[in-house]
């Protein structure tokens, strides 16, 4: 598949998921479609050789949406049986997700080559020489220093030189702030759920305790009703 055809397919998936989000009432389906949209957008970034931004979109946006999905499940009373019955109607989205994953793997396979360690290559070369499979020839060998400086990836440049190098302290502080925010929201949500359950238990009517507390009045009212 050509790059243009892959981009058209990913854009079509994004447009379809956007229309589903606009028409959907259930927030869970909206979140699932958002995850598909971000995955397709990360695939588009991989096709234009922006690996670092693609990884950031997957880690930050999809991770944040997964946490939001968890909060919605915690705060909304959702029947699991209804979800399972409704998910049977959305098999097309599973097919779209599989196509997106296959496309992403195709991009990774076409853009990256498998790197073999130099020790393995050296051992294999010595095996070929000793077994006289290949004949040695006098060929000039040199080291291309230009390729060492030019042929680099976006992830290596941004990660090793910028984030984990010059701005490592700020990166660690941002991670700590995000962790505090996630833990704080989970703690507040859990307290609200426990308080709501306690309030419902208090409002529950216990007939035995009411009868024992006002036994004479209950017997009298029962006799008068007859």
Curated annotation (Swiss-Prot):
Name of this protein: NADH-ubiquinone oxidoreductase chain 6
Tree of life domain: Eukaryota
Originating organism: Dictyostelium discoideum
Pfam families: Oxidored_q3 (PF00499)
Catalysed conversion reaction: a ubiquinone + NADH + 5 H(+)(in) = a ubiquinol + NAD(+) + 4 H(+)(out)
Family: Belongs to the complex I subunit 6 family.
Recorded GO CC terms: mitochondrial membrane
Entry annotated with the keyword Nucleotidyltransferase: no
Primary role: Core subunit of the mitochondrial membrane respiratory chain NADH dehydrogenase (Complex I) that is believed to belong to the minimal assembly required for catalysis. Complex I functions in the transfer of electrons from NADH to the respiratory chain. The immediate electron acceptor for the enzyme is believed to be ubiquinone.
Cellular localisation: Mitochondrion membrane
Major subcellular location class: mitochondrion
InterPro entries, A to Z: NADH_UbQ/plastoQ_OxRdtase_su6, Nuo/plastoQ_OxRdtase_6_NuoJ
Membrane topology note: Multi-pass membrane protein
Transmembrane segments: 2-22, 28-48, 56-76, 90-110, 169-189
Enzyme Commission number(s) from the entry: 7.1.1.2
Annotated keywords: Electron transport, Membrane, Mitochondrion, NAD, Respiratory chain, Translocase, Transmembrane, Transmembrane helix, Transport, Ubiquinone
Molecular functions (GO terms): NADH dehydrogenase (ubiquinone) activity
């Amino acid at each position: 598949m050509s790059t243009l055809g892959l981009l058209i397919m990913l854009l079509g998936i994004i447009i379809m998921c956007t229309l589903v989000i606009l028409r959907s009432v259930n927030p869970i389906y909206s979140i699932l479609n958002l995850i598909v949209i971000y995955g397709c957008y990360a695939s588009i970034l991989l096709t234009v050789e922006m690996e670092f931004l693609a990884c950031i979109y997957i880690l930050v946006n999809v991770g944040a949406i997964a946490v939001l999905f968890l909060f919605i499940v915690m705060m909304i009373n959702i029947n699991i049986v209804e979800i399972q019955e409704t998910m049977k109607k959305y098999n097309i989205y599973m097919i779209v997700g599989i196509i997106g994953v296959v496309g992403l793997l195709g991009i990774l396979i076409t853009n990256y080559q498998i790197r073999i360690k130099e020790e393995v290559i050296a051992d294999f070369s010595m095996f070929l020489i000793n077994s006289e499979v290949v004949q040695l020839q006098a060929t000039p060998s040199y080291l291309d220093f230009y390729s060492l400086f030019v042929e680099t990836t976006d992830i290596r440049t941004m990660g090793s030189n910028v984030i984990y190098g010059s701005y490592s302290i700020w990166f660690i502080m941002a991670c700590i702030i995000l962790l505090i925010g996630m833990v704080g929201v989970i703690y507040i949500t859990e307290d609200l759920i426990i308080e709501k359950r306690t309030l419902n238990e208090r409002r529950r009517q216990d007939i035995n305790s009411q009868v024992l507390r006002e036994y004479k009045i209950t017997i009298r009212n029962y006799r008068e009703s007859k």
